[in-house]
């Protein structure tokens, strides 16, 4: 298990409060398997993996916002495709 220096991670984010918010968001993604870890898991819990990613500069608040926006756009596109498909099925029935 790798050690995480919270101070180094906080320095990457800006302050410890934003660090907690960013790490919690990322850990939730990892826990729900919505995203793959950007660092080796090494049998660590999602919170430790999130902190390691932040410490290495792979994740920050802006990156998290972009990932979530991309996910929302992909979900909206999938929903629109499903609606179009159902409309076509109904029209042909």
UniProtKB/Swiss-Prot annotation:
Protein name: DNA-directed RNA polymerase subunit omega
Function field: Promotes RNA polymerase assembly. Latches the N- and C-terminal regions of the beta' subunit thereby facilitating its interaction with the beta and alpha subunits.
Enzyme class: transferase
PANTHER family in UniProt: DNA-DIRECTED RNA POLYMERASE SUBUNIT OMEGA
Entry GO terms, CC: DNA-directed RNA polymerase complex
Domain of life: Bacteria
GO molecular function, one term: DNA binding
Key word Lipid metabolism present: no
């Amino acid at each position: 298990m790798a050690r995480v220096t919270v101070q180094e991670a906080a320095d990457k984010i800006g302050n410890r409060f934003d660090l907690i918010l960013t790490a919690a968001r990322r850990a939730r993604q990892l826990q729900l398997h919505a995203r793959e870890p950007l660092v080796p898991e090494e049998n660590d819990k999602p919170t430790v993996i999130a902190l390691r990613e932040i410490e290495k500069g792979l994740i920050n608040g802006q990156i998290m916002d972009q990932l979530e926006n991309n996910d929302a756009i992909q979900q909206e596109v999938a929903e629109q495709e499903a609606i179009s498909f159902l409309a076509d099925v109904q029209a042909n029935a």
